Amino acid sequence: MANSNLTNARNAKNDEFYTQYQDIEKEILAYAEYNPEVFRDKTILMPCDDPEWSNFTKYFAQNFERLGLKKLISTSYAPDSKNYKNKYQPTLFETNDPQFDENKSVKNGKIFILERDKTGDGKIDVNDLEWHYLEGDGDYRSKEITSLRDEADFIITNPPFSLFRDFLAWIVAADKQFVIIGNMNAITYKEVFPLIKNDKMWLGNGFHAGNAYFSTPFAKEYADGVYNSETGLVKFRNVCWFTNIDHGRRHRPLTLMTMDANLRFSKHKEIKGKTEYDRYDNYDAIEVPFTDSIPSDYDGVMGVPISFLDKYCPEQFEILGTSDNGIIDDKYKLTPGLTNKFVEDYYKSGGTGSYKEGNPTAGYYQDQVAKMAYKRIFIKHKSVTI
């Protein structure tokens, strides 16, 4: 369900999803609590943001002085570039402003800037935002927005799901600090995983209980259980914050049981009662299907779900690679990929996935039945605890 929901998100007319204020506040406070000076005298750029509607703009404007910001810049796409089905209706905020231009309102993006006490009330807040039309349509790849990127210290936003790879590359190219929202499956993208493996990007503090709620003009296109008609929000579970800003949760080591204790007492039926952990047919590693089943005393390589990264502590584990693209040192590979025999056994056992010989997916035999492990990350303890 989660994957199909995000597919709908990618296919939505403009990937227009608005993050909840409390989720933004919870995330940003995690960085500020870990390092109270992290945002002091810094410039934050929020591209792809629709400042008139965005809770990102609202949060940072309201907390401008508390965070000690130097400057806040927020930009939006031109309505024409979003391919609205219905005629675009500008806000009263825009139409009541002397600089309102009916043509530019649909053809040009907008930029909002906060850096001074415009109202003269002795504080800098949301009432001091100043705006004007951009020269172009607000696409982050334009020279106009790229120059703003180069000026900024931080890039913070919820980019269109469909453009996540390209947007991240745009940030990384300028070596900026960032906090952005994306699909958790992006972890194993070949353009993304090396950043995680090399400790240049990690997961943020996270959404409450792992549930991300968004408002969107297309909410009713989602099924019951995803769209809540009472709140008008859609819920995605497979969404997370990606960042390169440090936070305290990242340095909390997992409390784990030994391998023997897991095999005897695990709450998971896939582990409890077994004589040993399953081993992959094509990787020199054991299959660990749950993060809380990682054995504390195993000094070899382990394959874990991508959700492990939400609990990853860099002082506790080393990330070695991923099965999704076979991005791992050859010394950990038993074969170049899935063997022809394993693939045949998989289909003989009733497997329905699409696999062929040489595929990097991690495969293993469970009670002599060939199984495929979905998107595994290979890890190893930095030091073993008995």
Q: Which residues does each predicted region cover?
A:
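Class I S-adenosyl-L-methionine-dependent methyltransferase catalytic core
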Residues: 1-156, 160-386
